[in-house]
Protein backbone atom coordinates (compact mmCIF):
# COMPACT_ATOMS: atom_id res chain seq x y z
CA UNK A 1 0.00 0.00 0.00
CA UNK A 2 2.76 2.46 0.93
CA UNK A 3 4.54 1.87 -2.41
CA UNK A 4 1.33 2.53 -4.37
CA UNK A 5 0.57 5.69 -2.44
CA UNK A 6 4.15 6.87 -2.82
CA UNK A 7 3.90 6.47 -6.60
CA UNK A 8 0.71 8.53 -6.55
CA UNK A 9 2.52 11.20 -4.56
CA UNK A 10 5.39 11.36 -7.07
CA UNK A 11 2.87 11.69 -9.91
CA UNK A 12 1.32 14.64 -8.11
CA UNK A 13 4.73 16.19 -7.50
CA UNK A 14 5.30 16.08 -11.26
CA UNK A 15 2.07 18.05 -11.70
CA UNK A 16 3.29 20.42 -9.00
CA UNK A 17 6.49 21.01 -10.97
CA UNK A 18 4.41 21.85 -14.05
CA UNK A 19 2.61 24.50 -12.01
CA UNK A 20 5.93 26.03 -11.01
CA UNK A 21 7.01 26.07 -14.67
CA UNK A 22 3.82 27.96 -15.50
CA UNK A 23 4.59 30.44 -12.72
CA UNK A 24 8.05 31.13 -14.08
CA UNK A 25 6.63 32.25 -17.41
CA UNK A 26 3.47 33.97 -16.14
CA UNK A 27 4.50 36.37 -13.41
CA UNK A 28 1.04 37.91 -12.97
CA UNK A 29 -0.33 34.58 -11.77
CA UNK A 30 2.46 33.65 -9.39
CA UNK A 31 0.79 34.29 -6.04
CA UNK A 32 -2.62 32.70 -6.68
CA UNK A 33 -1.08 29.76 -8.53
CA UNK A 34 1.45 29.22 -5.76
CA UNK A 35 -1.30 29.16 -3.14
CA UNK A 36 -3.29 26.66 -5.20
CA UNK A 37 -0.22 24.50 -5.71
CA UNK A 38 0.57 24.40 -2.02
CA UNK A 39 -3.01 23.44 -1.17
CA UNK A 40 -2.85 20.67 -3.78
CA UNK A 41 0.45 19.43 -2.45
CA UNK A 42 -0.70 19.45 1.17
CA UNK A 43 -3.84 17.52 0.24
CA UNK A 44 -1.96 14.90 -1.74
CA UNK A 45 0.67 14.53 0.92
CA UNK A 46 -1.84 14.10 3.72
CA UNK A 47 -3.51 11.35 1.71
CA UNK A 48 -0.32 9.52 0.80
CA UNK A 49 2.11 9.79 3.69
CA UNK A 50 2.58 6.94 6.10
CA UNK A 51 0.23 7.89 8.97
CA UNK A 52 2.65 6.30 11.43
CA UNK A 53 5.43 8.67 10.33
CA UNK A 54 4.21 12.17 9.51
CA UNK A 55 0.62 13.28 9.10
CA UNK A 56 1.23 16.20 6.72
CA UNK A 57 3.82 18.43 5.15
CA UNK A 58 3.68 20.94 7.96
CA UNK A 59 6.17 22.26 10.47
CA UNK A 60 4.68 20.11 13.22
CA UNK A 61 4.47 17.09 10.96
CA UNK A 62 8.17 17.31 10.14
CA UNK A 63 9.02 17.71 13.82
CA UNK A 64 6.98 14.61 14.57
CA UNK A 65 9.00 12.67 12.00
CA UNK A 66 12.27 13.98 13.41
CA UNK A 67 11.31 13.05 16.95
CA UNK A 68 10.45 9.50 15.95
CA UNK A 69 13.77 8.98 14.19
CA UNK A 70 15.82 10.67 16.92
CA UNK A 71 14.10 8.72 19.69
CA UNK A 72 14.55 5.41 17.88
CA UNK A 73 18.27 6.04 17.51
CA UNK A 74 18.75 7.08 21.13
CA UNK A 75 16.93 3.93 22.25
CA UNK A 76 19.13 1.72 20.06
CA UNK A 77 22.71 1.89 21.29
CA UNK A 78 25.53 1.92 18.78
CA UNK A 79 28.94 0.26 19.00
CA UNK A 80 31.13 3.02 17.59
CA UNK A 81 33.15 5.24 19.95
CA UNK A 82 31.33 8.49 20.66
CA UNK A 83 34.25 10.48 19.24
CA UNK A 84 34.03 8.57 15.94
CA UNK A 85 32.98 10.36 12.75
CA UNK A 86 29.87 8.18 12.55
CA UNK A 87 28.72 9.51 15.90
CA UNK A 88 29.92 13.02 15.06
CA UNK A 89 27.56 13.11 12.09
CA UNK A 90 24.69 11.83 14.24
CA UNK A 91 25.38 14.43 16.92
CA UNK A 92 25.57 17.23 14.34
CA UNK A 93 22.03 16.40 13.26
CA UNK A 94 20.87 15.78 16.82
CA UNK A 95 22.11 19.24 17.86
CA UNK A 96 19.99 20.87 15.16
CA UNK A 97 17.02 18.81 16.31
CA UNK A 98 17.66 19.83 19.92
CA UNK A 99 17.29 23.49 18.91
CA UNK A 100 13.71 22.98 17.74
CA UNK A 101 12.52 20.04 19.85
CA UNK A 102 11.05 22.21 22.59
CA UNK A 103 12.58 20.40 25.56
CA UNK A 104 15.99 19.77 27.10
CA UNK A 105 16.03 16.00 26.61
CA UNK A 106 18.22 16.08 23.52
CA UNK A 107 20.59 18.70 24.88
CA UNK A 108 21.02 16.53 27.97
CA UNK A 109 21.77 13.54 25.75
CA UNK A 110 24.48 15.45 23.88
CA UNK A 111 25.91 17.01 27.01
CA UNK A 112 26.29 13.56 28.58
CA UNK A 113 28.41 12.53 25.60
CA UNK A 114 30.67 15.54 26.08
CA UNK A 115 31.09 14.80 29.77
CA UNK A 116 31.91 11.15 29.04
CA UNK A 117 34.59 12.19 26.52
CA UNK A 118 35.87 15.01 28.71
CA UNK A 119 35.10 17.24 25.73
CA UNK A 120 37.93 15.72 23.73
CA UNK A 121 38.33 14.88 20.06
CA UNK A 122 39.42 11.53 18.67
CA UNK A 123 42.98 10.26 19.23
CA UNK A 124 44.41 11.06 15.77
CA UNK A 125 45.72 14.63 15.79
CA UNK A 126 45.41 15.48 12.08
CA UNK A 127 42.65 13.10 11.01
CA UNK A 128 39.49 14.95 9.96
CA UNK A 129 37.27 12.10 11.14
CA UNK A 130 38.40 12.68 14.71
CA UNK A 131 37.42 16.36 14.54
CA UNK A 132 33.80 15.85 13.47
CA UNK A 133 32.47 15.71 17.02
CA UNK A 134 33.58 19.32 17.38
CA UNK A 135 30.39 20.36 15.58
CA UNK A 136 28.44 19.14 18.60
CA UNK A 137 30.82 20.78 21.06
CA UNK A 138 30.40 24.19 19.43
CA UNK A 139 26.61 23.91 19.50
CA UNK A 140 26.73 22.97 23.18
CA UNK A 141 29.04 25.92 23.82
CA UNK A 142 26.54 28.20 22.10
CA UNK A 143 23.76 26.77 24.25
CA UNK A 144 25.50 26.88 27.64
CA UNK A 145 28.36 29.36 27.19
CA UNK A 146 30.93 27.10 28.89
CA UNK A 147 34.32 27.49 27.24
CA UNK A 148 35.59 24.17 28.59
CA UNK A 149 33.23 22.53 26.11
CA UNK A 150 35.38 23.70 23.19
CA UNK A 151 38.76 24.16 24.86
CA UNK A 152 40.23 20.79 23.77
CA UNK A 153 39.15 21.51 20.18
CA UNK A 154 40.71 24.96 20.40
CA UNK A 155 43.94 23.41 21.64
CA UNK A 156 43.98 20.87 18.81
CA UNK A 157 43.21 23.40 16.09
CA UNK A 158 45.70 25.92 17.41
CA UNK A 159 48.44 23.30 17.25
CA UNK A 160 47.44 22.18 13.75
CA UNK A 161 47.35 25.76 12.48
CA UNK A 162 50.87 26.33 13.81
CA UNK A 163 52.24 22.95 12.72
CA UNK A 164 50.22 21.92 9.66
CA UNK A 165 50.84 18.62 7.93
CA UNK A 166 53.02 18.88 4.84
CA UNK A 167 51.99 15.64 3.13
CA UNK A 168 50.52 15.79 -0.36
CA UNK A 169 46.89 14.95 -1.09
CA UNK A 170 47.38 11.60 -2.78
CA UNK A 171 45.32 9.03 -0.89
CA UNK A 172 48.23 6.71 -0.34
CA UNK A 173 50.47 5.75 2.56
CA UNK A 174 50.09 5.80 6.32
CA UNK A 175 49.83 9.60 6.53
CA UNK A 176 47.31 9.96 3.70
CA UNK A 177 44.61 11.20 6.06
CA UNK A 178 46.71 13.90 7.71
CA UNK A 179 45.11 16.37 5.29
CA UNK A 180 41.65 16.59 3.73
CA UNK A 181 42.55 14.15 0.96
CA UNK A 182 39.15 12.44 0.67
CA UNK A 183 35.89 14.22 0.02
CA UNK A 184 34.15 13.00 3.19
CA UNK A 185 36.60 15.13 5.15
CA UNK A 186 34.86 18.33 4.04
CA UNK A 187 31.99 17.52 6.38
CA UNK A 188 34.18 16.16 9.17
CA UNK A 189 36.67 18.96 9.79
CA UNK A 190 36.16 22.20 7.77
CA UNK A 191 32.72 22.59 9.33
CA UNK A 192 34.32 22.64 12.77
CA UNK A 193 37.04 25.06 11.70
CA UNK A 194 34.31 27.39 10.40
CA UNK A 195 32.33 27.09 13.64
CA UNK A 196 35.40 27.70 15.78
CA UNK A 197 36.23 30.77 13.70
CA UNK A 198 32.66 31.99 14.12
CA UNK A 199 32.68 31.77 17.91
CA UNK A 200 36.25 33.06 18.42
CA UNK A 201 36.88 35.46 15.53
CA UNK A 202 40.45 34.14 15.43
CA UNK A 203 41.72 34.41 11.85
CA UNK A 204 44.20 31.59 12.33
CA UNK A 205 41.28 29.21 12.03
CA UNK A 206 39.73 30.84 8.96
CA UNK A 207 43.11 31.05 7.20
CA UNK A 208 43.72 27.35 7.71
CA UNK A 209 40.18 26.55 6.57
CA UNK A 210 40.55 28.54 3.35
CA UNK A 211 43.99 27.17 2.51
CA UNK A 212 43.11 23.53 3.01
CA UNK A 213 39.65 23.71 1.42
CA UNK A 214 41.14 25.33 -1.67
CA UNK A 215 43.82 22.64 -1.90
CA UNK A 216 41.31 19.81 -1.53
CA UNK A 217 38.94 21.32 -4.07
CA UNK A 218 41.68 21.85 -6.64
CA UNK A 219 42.65 18.23 -6.23
CA UNK A 220 39.30 16.39 -6.01
CA UNK A 221 36.71 18.62 -7.68
CA UNK A 222 35.79 17.77 -11.27
CA UNK A 223 35.17 21.10 -12.99
CA UNK A 224 33.19 19.47 -15.78
CA UNK A 225 30.86 17.32 -13.69
CA UNK A 226 30.73 19.70 -10.70
CA UNK A 227 31.20 16.77 -8.34
CA UNK A 228 34.00 15.57 -6.09
CA UNK A 229 35.96 12.37 -6.55
CA UNK A 230 36.05 10.43 -3.31
CA UNK A 231 39.87 10.40 -3.37
CA UNK A 232 42.77 10.03 -5.82
CA UNK A 233 42.13 6.30 -6.24
CA UNK A 234 39.00 7.11 -8.25
CA UNK A 235 40.53 9.45 -10.82
CA UNK A 236 40.84 6.61 -13.33
CA UNK A 237 37.92 4.38 -12.30
CA UNK A 238 34.66 4.11 -14.20
CA UNK A 239 31.18 2.72 -13.62
CA UNK A 240 29.64 -0.09 -15.66
CA UNK A 241 28.06 2.47 -17.97
CA UNK A 242 31.46 4.03 -18.67
CA UNK A 243 30.92 7.16 -16.58
CA UNK A 244 33.17 8.45 -13.82
CA UNK A 245 32.68 7.17 -10.30
CA UNK A 246 31.07 9.83 -8.12
CA UNK A 247 29.85 8.44 -4.83
CA UNK A 248 26.43 9.53 -3.60
CA UNK A 249 27.21 9.86 0.09
CA UNK A 250 30.70 11.19 -0.59
CA UNK A 251 29.30 14.18 -2.43
CA UNK A 252 26.61 14.38 0.24
CA UNK A 253 29.32 14.94 2.82
CA UNK A 254 30.70 17.75 0.68
CA UNK A 255 27.36 19.43 0.00
CA UNK A 256 26.25 19.30 3.63
CA UNK A 257 29.69 20.52 4.64
CA UNK A 258 29.50 23.50 2.30
CA UNK A 259 26.06 24.44 3.61
CA UNK A 260 27.37 24.35 7.17
CA UNK A 261 30.52 26.31 6.35
CA UNK A 262 28.50 29.03 4.62
CA UNK A 263 26.20 29.21 7.64
CA UNK A 264 29.17 29.98 9.85
CA UNK A 265 31.15 32.41 7.70
CA UNK A 266 30.18 36.11 7.88
CA UNK A 267 28.28 37.49 4.90
CA UNK A 268 31.16 39.83 4.11
CA UNK A 269 33.86 37.20 4.56
CA UNK A 270 36.64 37.86 2.05
CA UNK A 271 36.77 34.33 0.62
CA UNK A 272 33.08 33.50 0.91
CA UNK A 273 32.61 33.48 -2.87
CA UNK A 274 34.99 30.53 -3.17
CA UNK A 275 32.58 28.40 -1.16
CA UNK A 276 29.48 29.89 -2.78
CA UNK A 277 30.72 29.09 -6.28
CA UNK A 278 31.21 25.40 -5.53
CA UNK A 279 27.93 25.22 -3.60
CA UNK A 280 25.90 26.69 -6.48
CA UNK A 281 27.57 24.52 -9.11
CA UNK A 282 26.94 21.40 -7.06
CA UNK A 283 23.34 22.38 -6.30
CA UNK A 284 22.48 22.64 -9.97
CA UNK A 285 24.19 19.36 -10.77
CA UNK A 286 22.66 17.46 -7.86
CA UNK A 287 19.17 18.72 -8.68
CA UNK A 288 19.53 17.14 -12.11
CA UNK A 289 20.52 13.78 -10.61
CA UNK A 290 17.52 13.23 -8.33
CA UNK A 291 15.56 10.12 -9.26
CA UNK A 292 11.85 10.26 -10.13
CA UNK A 293 11.11 8.65 -6.75
CA UNK A 294 12.82 11.53 -4.92
CA UNK A 295 15.97 9.66 -3.90
CA UNK A 296 19.57 10.01 -4.91
CA UNK A 297 21.51 6.79 -5.34
CA UNK A 298 24.82 5.30 -4.23
CA UNK A 299 26.32 6.13 -7.63
CA UNK A 300 25.38 9.55 -8.92
CA UNK A 301 26.15 8.91 -12.60
CA UNK A 302 25.18 5.24 -12.80
CA UNK A 303 21.97 4.85 -10.78
CA UNK A 304 20.89 1.89 -12.93
CA UNK A 305 23.68 -0.18 -11.38
CA UNK A 306 22.53 0.88 -7.89
CA UNK A 307 18.76 1.28 -8.26
CA UNK A 308 17.83 1.08 -4.59
CA UNK A 309 17.34 4.22 -2.48
CA UNK A 310 20.23 5.57 -0.41
CA UNK A 311 19.07 7.77 2.44
CA UNK A 312 22.33 9.12 3.82
CA UNK A 313 23.13 10.80 0.48
CA UNK A 314 19.49 11.81 0.00
CA UNK A 315 19.35 13.29 3.50
CA UNK A 316 22.44 15.40 2.97
CA UNK A 317 21.21 16.67 -0.40
CA UNK A 318 17.77 17.48 0.96
CA UNK A 319 19.45 19.38 3.79
CA UNK A 320 21.77 21.32 1.50
CA UNK A 321 19.12 22.23 -1.07
CA UNK A 322 16.58 23.28 1.56
CA UNK A 323 19.32 25.34 3.20
CA UNK A 324 19.93 27.04 -0.13
CA UNK A 325 16.28 28.01 -0.48
CA UNK A 326 16.11 29.23 3.11
CA UNK A 327 19.19 31.39 2.68
CA UNK A 328 18.33 32.92 -0.68
CA UNK A 329 20.81 31.01 -2.82
CA UNK A 330 18.35 28.82 -4.72
CA UNK A 331 15.09 29.94 -6.38
CA UNK A 332 12.00 28.29 -4.94
CA UNK A 333 10.43 27.91 -8.36
CA UNK A 334 13.08 25.39 -9.37
CA UNK A 335 14.25 23.81 -6.14
CA UNK A 336 11.21 23.60 -3.84
CA UNK A 337 9.64 20.67 -5.72
CA UNK A 338 12.99 18.86 -5.61
CA UNK A 339 13.32 19.35 -1.87
CA UNK A 340 9.74 18.27 -1.20
CA UNK A 341 10.20 15.13 -3.29
CA UNK A 342 13.41 14.43 -1.40
CA UNK A 343 11.79 14.81 2.01
CA UNK A 344 8.81 12.71 0.97
CA UNK A 345 11.23 9.97 -0.11
CA UNK A 346 13.08 10.16 3.19
CA UNK A 347 9.99 9.76 5.36
CA UNK A 348 8.92 6.78 3.27
CA UNK A 349 12.19 5.17 4.32
CA UNK A 350 11.25 5.36 8.00
CA UNK A 351 9.70 2.27 9.58
CA UNK A 352 6.63 2.78 11.81
CA UNK A 353 8.83 2.49 14.92
CA UNK A 354 11.17 5.28 13.76
CA UNK A 355 14.01 3.27 12.23
CA UNK A 356 15.58 4.97 9.21
CA UNK A 357 16.22 2.43 6.45
CA UNK A 358 18.14 2.25 3.17
CA UNK A 359 21.42 3.63 4.58
CA UNK A 360 24.56 2.47 2.79
CA UNK A 361 27.02 0.94 5.28
CA UNK A 362 30.46 2.39 5.95
CA UNK A 363 32.59 2.48 2.82
CA UNK A 364 34.27 4.69 0.28
CA UNK A 365 32.39 4.09 -2.95
CA UNK A 366 28.98 3.08 -4.30
CA UNK A 367 27.71 -0.22 -2.89
CA UNK A 368 24.45 -2.15 -2.88
CA UNK A 369 21.87 -1.12 -0.27
CA UNK A 370 18.92 -3.02 1.19
CA UNK A 371 15.95 -1.62 3.08
CA UNK A 372 16.89 -2.89 6.53
CA UNK A 373 20.34 -1.30 6.45
CA UNK A 374 20.67 1.61 8.88
CA UNK A 375 23.56 3.62 10.32
CA UNK A 376 23.80 6.48 12.77
CA UNK A 377 25.25 8.93 10.27
CA UNK A 378 22.15 8.41 8.13
CA UNK A 379 20.07 9.53 11.09
CA UNK A 380 22.29 12.60 11.37
CA UNK A 381 21.62 13.42 7.71
CA UNK A 382 17.87 12.94 8.22
CA UNK A 383 17.81 15.28 11.21
CA UNK A 384 19.83 17.92 9.35
CA UNK A 385 17.36 17.73 6.47
CA UNK A 386 14.42 17.97 8.85
CA UNK A 387 15.87 21.02 10.57
CA UNK A 388 15.90 22.92 7.28
CA UNK A 389 12.45 21.63 6.31
CA UNK A 390 11.06 23.10 9.53
CA UNK A 391 12.58 26.48 8.63
CA UNK A 392 11.29 26.21 5.08
CA UNK A 393 7.75 25.48 6.24
CA UNK A 394 7.93 28.25 8.83
CA UNK A 395 8.37 30.94 6.20
Model-derived segments and spans:
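Extended ligand-binding groove/face enriched in aromatic
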Residues: 102, 107-111, 119-235, 240-244, ...
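CBM-like carbohydrate-recognition segments
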Residues: 50-88, 97-116, 120-152, 156-159, ...
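Bacterial N-terminal signal peptides
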Residues: 34-44
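Short, Lys/Arg-enriched N-terminal segments with co-localized hydrophobic residues
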Residues: 10-22
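Extended ligand-binding clefts on enzyme/binding-domain cores
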Residues: 183-187, 191-300, 307-318, 330-359, ...
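Bacterial N-terminal signal peptides that target proteins for export
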Residues: 5, 22-35
Amino acid sequence: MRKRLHSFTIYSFEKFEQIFLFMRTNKNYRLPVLISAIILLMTVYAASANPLVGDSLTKEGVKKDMKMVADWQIAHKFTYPEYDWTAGALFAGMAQWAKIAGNETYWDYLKAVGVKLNWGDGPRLYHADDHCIGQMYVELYRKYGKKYMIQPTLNTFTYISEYPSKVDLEFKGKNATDRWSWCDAIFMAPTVWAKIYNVTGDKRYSSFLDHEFKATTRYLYDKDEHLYFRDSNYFTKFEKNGKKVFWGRGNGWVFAGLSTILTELPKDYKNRKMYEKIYLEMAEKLASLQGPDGYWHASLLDPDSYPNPETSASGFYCFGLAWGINNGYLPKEKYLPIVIKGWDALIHSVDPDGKLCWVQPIGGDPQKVTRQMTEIYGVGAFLLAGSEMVKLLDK
